[in-house]
Amino acid sequence: MQNSISQTSGTATSPRLIDVVKRLAPSPSHQHFDELQGEGSPWHNFFEQLGQTDLNELDRRTQTLARQVRDNGITYNVYADQDNPQRPWSLDLFPLILTPESWATIEVGIKQRADLLERVMADVYGPQQLIRDALMPPALVHGHPGYLRAMHGVSPVGGTHLHIAAFDLARSPDGQWAVVAQRTQAPSGLGYLLENRLLISRQFPQAFEAMHIQRLAATYRMWVESLKAHSPEGANAHVALLTPGPHNETYFEHTYLARYLGLTLVEGHDLTVRDERVYLRTLRGLEPVHVLIKRVDDEFLDPLELQPDSSLGIPGLLQAVRAGNVVVANTPGSAFLESPALLGFLPALAQKLLGQHLHLPGVDAWWCGERAALASVLPQIEHMVIKPTYAKSKLHGTFEAILGRSLTQAQRDEWVGRITRQPERYTLQAYAPLSQMPTWKNAKKGIVPRSVMLRVFALRNGKGLGSDAWRVLPGGLARLTGVDADIASMQRGGSSADVWVQTHADVDRSSLLPKYNSATAFKHRERMVTSRSGENLYWLGRYTERSENMVRLVRLCFEALNSETPASQNLWAWLQQMAQREGLVPEGLPATHSTGDAKNTAHMGGRRRVFERALIAGLNVGKQSTSVGYNLRSLQQAASSLRDRLSTELWNAIVNCVQQFSTDCAHASTPGKFSAVQAMQALDTASAALAGITGGQTDRMTRDDGWQLLSIGRHVERLGFLASALDLAVELGVFESTLEEADTLQDNTSHFAALLSLFDSTITFHAQYPQSRELAPLLNLLVQDDENPRSLAWVARTLRGRLSKLCLLYTSPSPRDCS
């Protein structure tokens, strides 16, 4: 596939899509295997199932897919893009389709390789006979930062080192699959491929059923059961997924995978080691953790024995592993297996350890630390891919893989010099042209070819050695190259595709839903709330309430500035001091109210314009910790650490609110121009969005301990803000002015209306005290009313109730002891 396939929009008599593809598809490339035109290609069946689907319909499905990706909050953090590191996940409309015969070859080869890596790992951290027999260079093991000396001689619980392994495959021009790389430390993709499957199968449900595509759920369930079986606790083992946190590039899939598999999502400081056992810090005390699926690199796992400045790990974790009290998947110390140099030694290792040839070949690789290899391949650097032997090593230096053919002669000479000076740092791998699969661009450009690399996963299916101890997930993650790229990488701007594996057998339609055998299985279970989650929920509540308060206060200021009826001097003093106290405008602004000075009064209009511009300019200040925009971003930051607890709709509402407010503020404040109208529109939009977010927190979250803390955070913030506002109003004589004012209640610049608006109690006051202008009803509503959720008494009573409930749970049987 070298050219694009395009077609004008379909009509009522549009030809079948397969006919369009057959007629316009170009001849296969001699440099790349063509998935579309290859022998026995399943694509013909796929397009047959689409029938008379026209290209505009494919465009509509692409748009639907992109919207679903956004709505589901699927992201991938790109470290190289400082301006926009968090990007929507890129997913192509068409899946990569594998025949049963092609998959059988992959499956057998991957099982064998996973078994081989397990045996290599056991030897390296045991007798090291492979090094003694000169089958592995010591420098590739002991010199690799991924080899952990602290783990030598450790026999992991259950006797298994590896529970998961990922392999990146390329299809050569002759149609044969070969291994390009292997990942064992913390392989990513298990969550993204699940989401890919969910989205793409919905786009082509008829084709998915008719083509007998294998399901994924049974393999995931088997893997979790295998992990539990390795623990002494067995089926009752508590399994947690250890994540570096929301700033990690694949954090979305950590939260998604934890939710899908029913795991507890934890960060390093959620865990502690006591008496050589791992515990989870929860609001109700310590809970044991028996199995830990880690997505943190090994070097950061234990600051006591590894990276001392790591804040991602758990002090004492390695000792808990030595004691056999926790299963870690994978056992720390497997990173050396990821070295590209090791690929060149695996054929001999397979002969030694398995007595077999490798069923699935690897792309040839040469470690330059061997003189003979260096002499033979360095002159061919133009046809090689240059890779670091010790990836991510601070000591040896690291870099992204480089295609020799992409270098100029001068650059190649420079690389030859580098490699010659320190050859052990470099590995040369033969360039493997990736196969090309059809991808959908749009109705104008049609179907275009993209090079693809396939990542497949081997998952543990029990204890012991042998290929039968592994199962290959019948699917995978297809990574497509970016435009004009030869290396598939999400960090380099590539995209992904679902992977469909056909079967001749019956499709296993198992799900992850447990089979309950008795009514006791349905008994109420308290959800564990980690201490970190509790803290983030508390601040989620505070920042939500604070954002709402700041929006109302700024709107009130703008209404006073732009009202036809001038606000009183006391009201101006109150609003300006409130804005300054909350940090919405800088200190030192000229007074917006009369101070008795005739000169001050004469320039009042100009002073208020300065105040208005300061309000607009400070709406979205990034470094000002009290701006509306900062509080909204802090709200999103707190929510990002709670993705496993928040609904997709609530998370999207928060993200959209922050993004929309930032966009609106940019329009309201441009160099030399400030627009109060656009600023008010930004605040109105944010206010409506925050109302939805509050509703989501109120009605879409379980009333567990975490929600109690969220509610406490909201009410602490509300009580502090409203009490402060009333205190300042009394100090400045606003209530005395209220007794004298003769404005109508509809005038938002009146003291009555201003106080009611800030307390969000305008409608309530009108309903309870129609046409009333008296101070007593106003104070009763704002201070003492037991049914107004904005009154100080209601907030204080509710806050006391929430605190008492938590106190009853943890310390005392009597609420009196908690007051």
Predicted segment positions?
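ATP-binding N-terminal substructure of ATP-dependent carboxylate-amine bond-forming enzymes
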Residues: 2-35, 163-164, 171-178, 182-354
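Short beta-strand or tight-loop elements
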Residues: 162-165, 382, 424, 452-454, ...
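Active-site nucleotide/adenylate-binding loops and adjacent lid/helix of ATP-dependent enzymes
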Residues: 103-127, 145-148, 253, 258, ...
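N-terminal amphipathic, basic-rich helices that act as targeting or association modules
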Residues: 34-42
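Short, surface-exposed, low-complexity cationic segments
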Residues: 42-59
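Alpha-helical transmembrane segments and their helix-helix packing motifs
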Residues: 62, 68-161, 172-174, 184-239, ...
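Polyanion-binding catalytic cores of nucleic-acid enzymes and NTP/SAM-utilizing transferases
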Residues: 380-383, 394-409, 413, 418, ...
